[in-house]
């Protein structure tokens, strides 16, 4: 029989009644959002505003970054260490990405900034491990809904982070501060919080114990 909207909503609610869902959702809202906020919203203003890049130069950086981000998920997929170590990798890589944003906040050398942006692009591939973590964290009959919820969280996170960093940049500029530094610090802080939440909130009972 066809599932009603009420039944579908109720079963999504079942996911939130599982304690380990919260860590997965929080991390999911921040990792992809951090990279996409850089690539989609702040890359051009950062390179042109802080380093004086032309539109063509900025476009070249964006093209290379997009190509990197296109292929690195396959590499991380092949390197997937399995359910137990995967969570450690997710915690470590999300903290490392936060550290790179922190470094970007204070970096004033154009070539070093471009290299750092490309390193961020290479590291962004770890996000594919989050999908594998979702599959390992729920029983088979709930996997589809869990993946849907995770994907929704990712795109809600993108919208929220771009909105928040836009507000913060406007506030910083109004008060005479460097808007790009404020944005990078904000993203670094959010990644650190998300990684910490993922590390310490309950984990799925389906995963092997350490």
Where are these regions (language model features)?
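A membrane-interface helix-boundary motif in multi-pass transporters
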Residues: 54, 167-189
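A late C-terminal transmembrane helix in Major Facilitator Superfamily
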Residues: 140-173
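Multi-pass alpha-helical transporter architecture, strongest
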Residues: 105, 185-210
């Amino acid at each position: 029989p066809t599932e009603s909207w009420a039944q579908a909503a109720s079963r999504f609610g079942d996911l939130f009644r599982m304690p380990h869902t919260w860590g997965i959702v929080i991390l999911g809202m921040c990792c992809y959002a951090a990279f996409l906020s850089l690539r989609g919203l702040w890359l051009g203003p950062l390179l042109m505003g802080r380093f004086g890049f032309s539109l063509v130069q900025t476009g070249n950086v964006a093209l290379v970054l997009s190509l990197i981000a296109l292929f690195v998920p396959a590499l991380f997929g092949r390197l997937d260490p399995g359910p137990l170590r995967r969570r450690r990798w997710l915690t470590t890589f999300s903290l490392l990405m936060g550290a790179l944003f922190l470094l970007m906040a204070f970096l004033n050398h154009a070539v070093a900034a471009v290299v750092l942006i490309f390193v961020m692009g290479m590291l962004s591939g770890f996000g594919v491990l989050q999908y594998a973590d979702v599959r390992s964290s729920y029983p088979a009959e709930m996997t589809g809904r869990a993946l849907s919820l995770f994907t929704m969280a990712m795109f809600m996170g993108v919208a929220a982070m771009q909105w928040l960093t836009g507000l913060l940049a406007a506030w910083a500029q109004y008060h005479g501060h460097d808007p790009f530094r404020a944005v990078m610090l904000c993203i670094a802080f959010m990644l650190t919080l998300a990684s910490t939440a993922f590390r310490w909130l309950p984990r799925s009972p389906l995963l092997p114990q350490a």
